């Protein structure tokens, strides 16, 4: 693991530190200020004299910073070091005249990637750069693996995901994306709390998977000697809480689906689901628009965003029915979509994976996915979903073949799914039976029968509307990320050879970032 030549060279320097009485993994620091705050606090000095050769210690406030070394420029008895902490990069000037004989050891052992603690005072160099004039320097952590040079040594996309810790060090844009993600999640919580919703937590391990049409992960509970399923959605437990008397609840957590991976799907993903008693799906459409307006205001985002080279106008929101979208947006003939046999023949002629066993609603769903979804660029609510593909949604009073349901599409991707909840226990029981038949016929994504949930409904659930929003896709949208892996810190990846072998096989190493001048 540590046999690489460059690693061995660094280990020797670490051992030299120990021989000289220095701990290469020191614990205590004297940090007083972040790099960002240092630059802000002393920015006024840039307007004053920048002569760094004079003795400026008198009446100077001593500050202490910490961070990772990103660049070293050696100049005989002095050097300049770029130090990076979470807030930014600050330059330190280090001279033998200030730190004495320690300078010689530091010159021998300090390398790019090491984490250091520098104490000194603010000054401006002759080139006009605000810096810290070092009085003491301590190596806090010796890095024994070289960093890639800028990003040239870590240009393999998969490697960036596997070694996210390196990606975060060398690519500030990646760090900013995840800071934005944190802000988005925080704003979402603020929004629902201000609306009077209560945040709750429901089980991650389910005895019966439910709440979505998806294939679950299966594990085994040794103490109980029973199989358990990682949850594919929290929906059925959240609606049990509505039965119990809570009227406005949300859960922001992880879901797991044992399915394929692509640019917009990860088997482990984050969602917020929220349920609102005595409301309808129309109320949720309004609430969703209010949520986006809240996010855009809090995050100071423009109403027009670029995502995946598409310009999205958030000032215009559209609502259109399912079949109407197939005709007007998908370009399908009304006579075809109104006839199950004609629709099946048409989809087969387009070489889609359909067959006679599929329900009419399932065929409509296949047509929608193929001909409509990718064309929904500006925010669009699709309503009046086929009842066959909406097993947990309430039937529409005027047309029992469709559900009181919507999905929100932005940038050609599904962002949210909401509906007026089915609260008729007998109807729900019959739909579960239909789902069970579909599963027996080979539909691995069909839902399981959950009699306890039906029994909960039998106690009476008030009219309720519920919705789920994918956090990862939302962050992709607002950060202009091209793949879901760019917004998940540690995404699921295919197994590969040892990470250590991969990273150390790179030739462009950080040693090139140490510049020596006579």
Swiss-Prot record:
The gene is lysS. It comes from Helicobacter hepaticus (strain ATCC 51449 / 3B1). Homodimer. Belongs to the class-II aminoacyl-tRNA synthetase family. GO terms for biological process: lysyl-tRNA aminoacylation. This is Lysine--tRNA ligase. Binds 3 Mg(2+) ions per subunit. InterPro entries: Aa-tRNA-synt_II, aa-tRNA-synth_II, aa-tRNA-synth_II/BPL/LPL, Lys-tRNA-ligase_II, Lys-tRNA-ligase_II_N, Lys-tRNA-synth_II_C, NA-bd_OB-fold, NA-bd_OB_tRNA. Its main location: cytoplasm. Its cofactor is Mg(2+). GO terms for cellular component: cytosol. The keyword Nucleotide-binding applies.
């Amino acid at each position: 693991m540590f046999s690489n030549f460059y690693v061995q060279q660094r280990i020797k320097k670490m051992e030299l530190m120990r021989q000289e009485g220095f701990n290469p993994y020191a614990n205590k620091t004297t940090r007083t200020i972040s790099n960002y705050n240092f630059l802000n606090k002393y920015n006024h000095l840039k307007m004053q004299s920048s002569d760094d050769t004079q003795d400026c210690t008198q009446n100077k406030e001593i500050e202490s910073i910490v961070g990772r070394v990103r660049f070293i420029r050696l100049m005989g008895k002095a050097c300049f070091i770029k130090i990076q902490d979470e807030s930014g990069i600050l330059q330190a000037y280090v001279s033998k005249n200030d730190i004495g004989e320690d300078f010689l050891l530091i010159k021998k052992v300090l390398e790019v990637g090491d984490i250091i603690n520098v104490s000194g005072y603010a000054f401006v160099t002759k080139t006009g750069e605000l810096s810290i004039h070092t009085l003491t320097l301590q190596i806090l952590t010796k890095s024994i693996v070289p960093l890639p040079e800028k990003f040239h040594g870590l240009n393999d996309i998969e490697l960036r995901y596997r070694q996210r810790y390196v990606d975060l060090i060398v690519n500030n844009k990646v760090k900013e994306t995840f800071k934005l993600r944190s802000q988005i999640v925080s704003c979402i919580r603020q929004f629902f709390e201000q609306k009077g919703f209560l945040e709750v937590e429901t089980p991650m391990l389910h005895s019966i998977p439910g709440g979505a049409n998806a294939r679950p992960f299966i594990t085994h509970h040794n103490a109980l000697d029973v199989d358990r399923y990682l949850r594919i959605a929290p929906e059925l437990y959240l609606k049990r809480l509505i039965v119990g008397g809570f009227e406005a609840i949300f859960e922001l957590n992880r879901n797991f689906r044992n399915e394929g991976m692509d640019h917009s799907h990860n088997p482990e993903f984050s969602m917020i689901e929220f349920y609102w008693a005595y409301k309808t799906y129309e109320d949720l459409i309004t609430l969703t628009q209010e949520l986006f307006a809240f996010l855009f205001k809090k995050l100071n985002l423009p109403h027009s965003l670029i995502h995946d080279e598409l310009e999205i106008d958030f000032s215009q929101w559209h609502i259109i029915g399912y079949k109407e979208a197939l005709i007007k947006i998908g370009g399908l003939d009304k006579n075809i979509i109104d006839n199950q046999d004609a629709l099946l023949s048409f989809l087969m002629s387009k070489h889609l994976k359909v067959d006679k066993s599929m329900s009419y609603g399932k065929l409509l769903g296949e047509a929608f996915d193929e001909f409509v979804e990718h064309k929904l660029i500006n925010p669009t609510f699709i309503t009046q979903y086929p009842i066959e593909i909406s097993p947990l949604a309430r039937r529409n009073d005027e047309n029992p073949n469709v559900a009181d349901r919507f999905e929100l599409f932005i940038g050609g991707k599904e962002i949210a799914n909401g509906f007026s909840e089915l609260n008729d226990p007998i109807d729900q029981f019959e739909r579960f039976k239909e789902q069970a038949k579909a599963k027996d016929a080979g539909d691995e994504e069909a839902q399981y029968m959950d009699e306890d949930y039906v029994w909960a409904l039998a106690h009476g659930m008030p009219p309720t509307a519920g919705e789920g929003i994918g956090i990862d896709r939302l962050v992709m949208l607002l950060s202009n990320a091209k793949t879901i892996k760019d917004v998940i810190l540690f995404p699921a990846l295919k197994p590969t050879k040892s990470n250590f072998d991969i990273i150390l096989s790179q030739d462009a190493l950080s040693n090139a970032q140490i510049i020596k001048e006579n």
